[in-house]
Amino acid sequence: MKLGIVGLPNVGKSTLFNAITNAGAESANYPFCTIDPNVGMVAVPDHRLDKLAEMYHPKKTTPAVIEFVDIAGLGKGASRGEGLGNKFLGNIRMTDAIVHVVRCFDDDNVIHVEGSTDPVRDMDTIDLELVMADLEMVERRIDKAKKAAKGDKKFLQEAADFEGLRDWLNDGKSARSYEDVDIAAEYPDCELLSLKPVIYAANLDEDGFSNPESVSYYCQVEQRAKEQGAQVIPVCAKLEAEIAELDGEEKKMFLDDLGVAESGLDRLVKASYTLLGLISYLTSGEDECRAWTIKKGTKAPQAAGKIHSDFERGFIRAEVVSYEDLMACGTMAAAREKGLIRSEGKEYVVQDGDIILFRFNV
């Protein structure tokens, strides 16, 4: 699963990406400093995995990961191919969801392409570019369906569905908010940009990050996101870049001094994981404790297949204990004595935080 970090030039995208991945992507104070997308695999924070590692002292601890792509700054005219628009939009098309970084601070030393800070305007600018790019694709889809309908009448419905969507997009509304037809379900091959789920990362200065609700820019972003049914995560990209350099104990002390329980980046990564409909199950032992990524609703054999195809092919059963039950008992042996380790079959839907031992035979 892949998330694209997007936003106008100079809103803090690359700084945020660098903090998330600890990768030194070029970050400079001028538009289009990130021409090729930078890709980073990011560990998903999970206290459950940390606790398992404390319990087992394994040789190796492997967290779940999620992929972030830093996509160069979009601007007005991107949907018409202006600037490097076509390249940027193509990079967004390859992602599963969007993290839209919005500037929520004033700084005369960091040039805004519009000359002023207005987060709602910036949100609308990017949203409109994605909608305009989708309109072009939808028009082509309608033409193709109408031609196909001459030989097969079933394509008439497809043409009608996309004509309804075209009218919606023409009003400047995203495909995400279109309810007449479930485009994603009915036409899964249609990769519309404005259909992708989105999280807004409100990039604040240090003072604002400690108390985002006191910042009018943040409140504006929050209100607009609420109208869209989207989530907003407050971050301070510059500060997060410093936090990312600290080890666990130093990081905790730093956050305590700021008066926040969790870094904005940790919240953003977790929220992104949830946005994609992902959960983690855990495996434990002296060799390795590991979090495995699956889609919510995945059944036990398919979850086992994430470890190895043989596990799925020869699946017999899954021995499952919930994280909460294991922590309450203190050891796996104690959980077994209390009858808290369940034997589940092929129809079992794996739950977030399940600790599983798969039995298989090939």
Language model region names:
Residues M1-I111, V138-R140, A145:
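Conserved G1/Walker A P-loop phosphate-binding module
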Residues K2-V6, V11, F17, K144-Q351, ...:
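C-terminal-of-GTPase-core extension/linker across diverse P-loop GTPases
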Residues S14, P31, E67, T117, ...:
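Generic signal for short, ordered secondary-structure residues
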Residues N22, E54, G90, L128, ...:
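Short, intrinsically disordered, mixed-charge
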Residues A23-P31, N38-G40, R48-K51, R80, ...:
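Glycine-rich, flexible loop/turn motifs
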Residues F32, D46-L49, T62-F68, E82-D96, ...:
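Amphipathic alpha-helical transducer elements in NTP-driven molecular machines
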Residues G40-P45, A72-E82, R93-F155, W168-D182, ...:
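Conserved Switch II/interswitch segment of TRAFAC-class P-loop GTPases
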